[in-house]
């Protein structure tokens, strides 16, 4: 009688191993020209038929990141069922704009209106889709929201680079740099119920896209009361200074507390010099409403970052404070301000060095730019480098504010000057048994005694120790202290 071989026991893998096998099987670099194109491969859904375990893993990866445009939003409720909401970690909202006009010409009024209408209907469709979601519907930590625009011509960016495509891309970038997508009816967004499942917001992640107005961003943010991290991009704030008043009003509508708020102009890279011009007379306000709105909102923050936008000392303290209405920042721990050398009203915070050579002596940049692209030319514009008297008042206002910030651990105030040539930086840092203040500049700036006395009061009030003061001309002094304190 033949002896039967014993049946082999099935191989049972740990769930973590199965997860990793499935993950790397269904993910790859989709576009070889782009290192950031890691994603789900075409046809990955067929693996769901292997077993129930595989089906659950495939579904989890499918709904972890939703890419929604207007067409998909209209069908999303039928696909993203109530049970699947818990699988969603990120939503990438794509405002798919109509085909643009010729890249050789500026955006027309008709084209701008079409784009604005598309933003309006996309935001409204998103509100209708997300408003029913509750915090208990989604995973712990909520859902991150990323918002960008796209146009049908975006596909060309994945093609092999040729001299012709490079020239076309340069023209397209300049055309997009002069465009801004705005809501046609912001009040309609305000009428929707709040979205409670979104805990983080970020938009305008690519310089190649047509950018969404910071006002539209804030209108949407005002409907996201669970958001703890938010990034507001005021694209080319100097060029689009006309929206400053509307942006101030939109920020004032954000009533809830946020852990971390960042407001920046993504068209600039910190440290790069850019020729700034005074704002047009039509956009100048006697009262800096934007700085006041940010100041009011910052009293509900833990961390505030501002990069490359024009502000005034109203950001820190009202010019005519009332004893009964003194601002107080109970929870603010960190503030980082990288500010332009010119205020909203056209006042220069830094003056040109009379001994420095004029920028007109430099070789002009021949980038084939056209007259309509909105980028100012440097020509013979002097570059500011020496702190104006207004900077003493600026630091005094900052000290007044710091006295009202009992939780403050760090404040950085850094001027956007010519990288590697000029610098002007301030840094305040405190911990349980130590408090430091550093001023470092290329022009030999020294704070006056009133400023120093006011800053010495800050740690005495909050942690009852004396302030260590350092005045330097070392460009890297601030970074060295950062490393020393491991910030």
Set out the residue ranges of the language-model regions.
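Generic preference for well-ordered alpha-helical elements
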Residues: 14-19, 37-51, 116-123, 213-217, ...
């Amino acid at each position: 009688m033949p002896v039967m071989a014993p049946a082999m026991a099935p191989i049972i893998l740990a769930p973590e191993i199965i997860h990793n096998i499935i993950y790397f099987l269904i993910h790859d670099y989709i576009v070889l020209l782009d290192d950031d194109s890691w994603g789900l491969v075409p046809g990955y859904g067929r693996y769901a038929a292997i077993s129930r375990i595989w089906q659950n893993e495939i579904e989890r990866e499918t709904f972890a990141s939703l890419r929604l445009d207007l067409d998909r939003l209209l069908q999303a409720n039928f696909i993203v069922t109530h049970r699947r909401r818990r699988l969603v970690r990120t939503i990438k909202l794509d405002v798919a704009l109509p085909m643009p006009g010729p890249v050789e010409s500026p955006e027309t009024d008709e084209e701008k209106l079409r784009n604005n209408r598309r933003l309006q209907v996309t935001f409204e469709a998103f509100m209708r889709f997300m408003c029913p979601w509750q915090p208990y519907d989604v995973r712990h930590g909520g859902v991150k929201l990323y918002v960008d625009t796209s146009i049908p011509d975006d596909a060309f960016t994945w093609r092999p680079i040729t001299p012709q495509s490079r020239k076309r891309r340069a023209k397209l970038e300049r055309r997009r740099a002069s465009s801004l997508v705005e809501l046609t009816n912001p009040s309609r967004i305000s009428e929707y119920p709040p979205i409670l499942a979104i805990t983080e917001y970020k938009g305008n992640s690519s310089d190649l896209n047509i950018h969404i107005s910071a006002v539209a961003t804030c209108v949407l943010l005002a409907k996201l009361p669970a958001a703890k991290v938010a990034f507001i991009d005021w694209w080319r704030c100097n060029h689009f200074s006309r929206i400053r008043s509307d942006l101030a009003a939109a920020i004032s509508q954000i009533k809830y507390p946020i852990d971390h708020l960042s407001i920046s102009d993504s068209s600039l890279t910190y440290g790069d010099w850019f020729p700034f011009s005074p704002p047009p007379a039509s956009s100048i306000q006697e009262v800096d409403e934007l700085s006041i709105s940010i100041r009011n909102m910052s009293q509900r923050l833990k961390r505030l970052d501002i990069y490359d936008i024009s502000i005034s000392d109203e950001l820190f303290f009202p010019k005519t404070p009332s004893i009964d209405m003194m601002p107080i920042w109970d929870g603010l721990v960190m503030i980082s301000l990288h500010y332009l050398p010119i205020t909203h009203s056209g006042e220069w915070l830094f003056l040109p060095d009379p001994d420095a050579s004029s920028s007109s002596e430099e070789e002009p940049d021949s980038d084939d730019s056209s007259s309509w692209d909105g980028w100012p030319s440097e020509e013979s514009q002097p570059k500011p480098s020496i702190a104006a008297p207004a900077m003493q008042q600026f630091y005094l206002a900052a000290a007044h504010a710091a006295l009202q910030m009992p939780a403050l651990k760090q404040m950085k105030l850094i001027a956007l000057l010519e990288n590697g040539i000029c610098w002007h930086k301030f840094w305040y840092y405190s911990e349980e048994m130590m408090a430091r203040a550093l001023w470092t500049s290329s022009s030999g700036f020294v704070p006056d005694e009133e400023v120093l006395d006011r800053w010495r009061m800050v740690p005495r009030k909050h942690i009852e120790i004396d302030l260590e003061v350092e005045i330097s001309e070392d460009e890297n002094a601030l970074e060295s202290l950062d490393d020393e304190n491991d910030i």
